[in-house]
Amino acid sequence: MPRSHNIEDYRNFGIMAHIDAGKTTTTERILYYSGKSHKIGEVHDGAATMDWMEQEQERGITITSAATTTFWNGKRLNIIDTPGHVDFTIEVERSLRVLDGAVCVLDGNQGVEPQTETVWRQADKYHVPRIVFVNKMDKIGADFYRCVDEIKTKVGGRPVCIQLPIGSESDFKGIIDLVRMKAVVWQDEALGAKYNDAEIPAELLAKAEEYRHILIETAVELDDDVMSAYLDGVEPDEETLKRLIRKAVRYITFIPILCGSAFKNKGVQPLLDAVVDYLPSPIDREAIKGVDVDTGEEVLRMPRDEDPFSMLAFKIMDDPFVGTLTFARVYSGHVESGTTVLNSTKDKKERIGRMLLMHANNREDVKEAYSGDIVALAGLKDTRTGDTLCDLSKPVILERMEFPEPVIEIAIEPKSKADQEKLGLALAKLAAEDPSFRVSTDQESGQTILKGMGELHLDIKVDILRRTYKVDANIGAPQVAYRERLTKRVEIDHTHKKQTGGTGQFARVIIVFEPNEAGAGNVFESKIVGGSVPKEFIPGVEKGINSVMGSGILAGFPVVDVKATLIDGGFHDVDSSVLAFEIAARAAFREALQKGGSVLLEPIMKVEVTTPEDYTGSVMGDLLGRRGQVQGQDMRGNAVVINAMVPLANMFGYVNQLRSFSQGRANYTMQFDHYEQVPAGEAAKVQAKYA
């Protein structure tokens, strides 16, 4: 089956924003107006098409990014709806990795919020071109111009308006299109309401001309010929201006700003036009880099059907009807169902069975997928998030994704033997779907430990275990994921000697242990020359060191950011073995932890509290009482926004406390920022509790 659309007519884009900015509602309207959805789903009545997990419909937030294909003006739109809650940042990161562009939705009243900053940084990391849609222009307190200003001051973007609002709050009637210099006015707020072009209202003409002047002056910088014509008094025509805006978006030179109210059905069609006109197609983006498996050299994969096939898996989901679904993007070449391909990350073959195009939770079988397509594959055995699937004869590993470390953990105990068996299977599936969710076993108690990015993240996992997998279990209180690290360099000379008749055990190691840079991870290096430790025993040294990394000496927490260098040692021709060196290295590391000034580290969270002015003192005092460091405060409308760094250990149950002293009027967001040493007094309490 040939392509239905040329690759230059594809738009692979995501919709990203802070929680409650109206992201899912905007997507619902896009699906409605582009003809994919015949009944509009409202988030607040739990019927949105994109939010199809039970937990999402109840909580009114988007947890998993659902991929949807739809069409507008002859272009094929592959939309990824991403979650805005900070505990699900991993979902945003995964979807941005495979997108060519993004629509950043802002709440017209709230402006740039903490999670907006987070997703903006992630989009910067992957160089994702974007446009901004200032939503909720009908909301009380909506301020389009403040939102534009905050893009500059809070995320360092270069905003350029291509639309202006006509009215705001209950008087919001439509938009001014600065490219065509026309007003676009909606007749009413009903679904599918008609809209007409009109002349720009006289009272807004001067402002429209001022902002169009800024748009043109900024756009002509991108083309010398257009610039010189403009300096000679010739303004660019509509087509030229669109071409320049498209170029600006592609290279992230400036960010076009649009506005509307998705809920009131105003501004969605012009937003769709902007997606088609300005966001890049797969061929406008740089070729994806990979590593040739055979040679180890960097190679490029071009978005062409005739290139060798390569595809990146970016999401695993368990579907109640189809089983495990692997969402993947084809970067080069094409693939047919029934083909055997290579998972080059795992060096295992996979057979492509069913291939599905997804519309939220409806699905359509397809026989072939081409470069630029985003499809769901059913029945893959070994493929996980971040794995590459490719042509057997041209193996390549595409860029891998990086996932954050979990900062919070809970213990879970199944109530019966039957629950124990179900729990094991369910946790394996959940961990495969979400790389930021980890499962481990406590060595001493034998308890199963779940680790995640926040309380809500783990709440939802437990909810899924109970509802979807019918596991009945007791859940422990959330615990902080502390870490341990060395503070000084130590050199340890340790000899392991054991003689019990017959062959004995002998190994001597001299290892330098020192703190690595924060976040650099644990590193092992061998500097053995002259064979004082034969090379076949060196893996035993590394294994011994790694076995201690998982449990430090202070309170049994993982040891992080240590560099271990094997510099010398000794062996016996008969009594030395890999096991002997493993035991020696383990003992050496434990000694190093004793002598190297081990300290406890704790996760520090970036907290932003938005509160009416009356409660500012209470909020500040409470944060300081939680060992918080207030970084500053500013006004947002008539509310005060307080920024602070607070240890996670002191943030449990904060939401209830905040509600009680602000009568429910203050709210907060929190995200992991960094690890920091625990003060001595607090460290003693932690050690007493866990050691």
From Swiss-Prot:
Main subcellular location: cytoplasm
InterPro entries: EF-G-like_DII, EFG_II, EFG_III, EFG_III/V, EFG_IV, EFG_V, EFG_V-like, G_TR_CS
Pfam families noted in UniProt: EF-G_D2, EFG_C, EFG_III, EFG_IV, GTP_EFTU
GO MF terms, alphabetically ordered: GTP binding; GTPase activity; translation elongation factor activity
NCBIfam families recorded: EF-G, PRK12740.1-5, small_GTP
Family label: Belongs to the TRAFAC class translation factor GTPase superfamily. Classic translation factor GTPase family. EF-G/EF-2 subfamily.
Role description: Catalyzes the GTP-dependent ribosomal translocation step during translation elongation. During this step, the ribosome changes from the pre-translocational (PRE) to the post-translocational (POST) state as the newly formed A-site-bound peptidyl-tRNA and P-site-bound deacylated tRNA move to the P and E sites, respectively. Catalyzes the coordinated movement of the two tRNA molecules, the mRNA and conformational changes in the ribosome.
PANTHER family: RIBOSOME-RELEASING FACTOR 2, MITOCHONDRIAL (PTHR43261:SF1), TRANSLATION ELONGATION FACTOR G-RELATED (PTHR43261)
Name of the protein described by the UniProt record: Elongation factor G
Organism of provenance: Methylocella silvestris (strain DSM 15510 / CIP 108128 / LMG 27833 / NCIMB 13906 / BL2)
Gene: fusA
